[in-house]
Amino acid sequence: MDYIDKKLLLFLGRENFLKIKDYPKFYKKVWLTLLKIPEGEVRTYKWVAQKIGCPKAARAVGKALKENPLPVIIPCHRVIKSSGEIGGYSLGVRKKIALLKKEGVKIKI
């Protein structure tokens, strides 16, 4: 088990970790970064890409978010477009907006 897997196991617990253990390492790096975004704050796909050391991989970050098997636990709803637009969400944009509002994020529609 490598460092990223150990950190994800620590953050998610065994049951949730088992749901993601076979995904690509890139996805796991993205998801670990998402777990560090504080509730009530948002970041961009580009920011996440830069944080994981792949500054040109914003689209690949979006793909990792789309494949997130634990979309509320691993908070991909906290990632938005650089333009400030909400962007997509596997559970639907309405759900993403509701989650962000619940966390205190001001949403411009």
Where are these regions (language model features)?
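Structural motif
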Residues: 69-73, 86
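…primarily DNA-binding HTH/wHTH and HhH modules…
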Residues: 85-109
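Basic nucleic-acid-binding alpha-helical/helix-turn surface characteristic of O6-alkylguanine DNA
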Residues: 1-56, 102-109
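Regulatory, non-catalytic segments
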Residues: 56-70
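Short Lys/Arg-enriched helix C-cap and helix-to-coil transition segments
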Residues: 72-80
